[in-house]
């Protein structure tokens, strides 16, 4: 999660999924029959992963089982410095690379990500988002999240202040300030995602399309890096707090 030194917007997003290199394109074509078989097989396995995650209560055991099952889907999760994860922090701040970042981090620790876009209901719930019933302004959302965080028994919040998935290579979108208005201590989490043959994510692609491509490729590796918690300074504005956390990410 590197601080963005104002890179051009076009550098932050990938518009083409397929490789332009001739050798990689040939390799992708040769792999395609295998990828299609994996896609079909993983769709069936994915249903079982979903059912298991629904049936089992949130616990270390469930996260372990689902993480192992996700490896069959080609999703591998690595984390560095797990001891830095602060059990007292109620807000995690992460960069945004794919449509499934919140699901991946949830394999490592219990957390909730509020639904910011899209219609509420089964799809929202099945994707692992938390519905707050707030459809108004960001101020109303912040008030709801403050109320949520005031109950210490609730899992921490996982928020993505970029509010859009980037390629994770060229820098970060400028952080929105509202996630830093909830509490005075946050913990940054850096995400890196790698996969062979095709790009990790494409701008404006739907989550269903991204899921199908994820099942098609041989594997996708998520690297999660925990960083020390960052407290707000005295009388520090949320905008300045957001900028400082973004810089700490580097």
Predicted feature residues:
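Amphipathic alpha-helical interface elements that mediate macromolecular binding in regulatory proteins
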Residues: 24, 28-31, 35, 39-47, ...
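Eukaryotic intrinsically disordered and solvent-exposed regulatory patches
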Residues: 35, 76-80, 85, 98-102, ...
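A cross-family acyltransferase "interaction/gating" segment
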Residues: 126, 153-156, 163-240
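N-terminal membrane-anchoring alpha-helices
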Residues: 1-76
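Intracellular leaflet-associated regions of eukaryotic membrane-associated proteins
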Residues: 1-24, 121-125, 137-152, 168, ...
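Catalytic core of membrane glycerolipid acyltransferases/transacylases, capturing the structured
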Residues: 43-140
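Generic beta-sheet signal
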Residues: 37, 88-94, 152-161
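Residues that form ligand- and interface-recognition hot spots within folded domains
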Residues: 30, 81-84, 96, 109, ...
């Amino acid at each position: 999660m590197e601080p963005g030194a104002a890179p051009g917007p076009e550098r932050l997003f990938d518009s083409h999924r397929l490789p332009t290199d001739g050798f990689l394109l040939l390799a992708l074509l040769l792999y395609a029959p295998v990828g299609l078989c994996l896609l079909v097989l993983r769709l069936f396995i994915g249903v079982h992963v979903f059912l298991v995650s629904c049936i089992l209560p949130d616990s270390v055991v469930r996260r372990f089982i689902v993480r192992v099952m996700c490896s069959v889907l080609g999703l591998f999760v690595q984390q560095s410095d797990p001891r830095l994860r602060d059990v007292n922090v109620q807000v995690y701040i992460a960069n945004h690379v794919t449509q499934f970042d919140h699901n991946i981090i949830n394999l490592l620790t219990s957390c909730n990500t509020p639904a910011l876009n899209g219609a509420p209901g089964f799809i929202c719930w099945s994707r692992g988002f938390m519905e707050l019933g707030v459809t108004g302004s960001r101020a109303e959302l912040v008030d709801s999240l403050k109320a949520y965080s005031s109950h210490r028994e609730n899992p921490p919040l996982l928020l993505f202040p970029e509010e859009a998935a980037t390629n994770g290579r060229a820098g970060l979108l400028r952080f929105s300030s509202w996630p830093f208005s909830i509490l005075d201590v946050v913990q940054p989490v850096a995400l890196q995602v790698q996969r062979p043959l095709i790009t990790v994510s494409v701008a404006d692609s739907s989550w269903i399309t991204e899921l199908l491509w994820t099942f098609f490729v041989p594997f996708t590796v998520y690297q999660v890096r925990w960083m020390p918690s960052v407290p707000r300074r005295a009388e520090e504005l949320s905008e300045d707090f957001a900028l400082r956390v973004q810089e700490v990410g580097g």
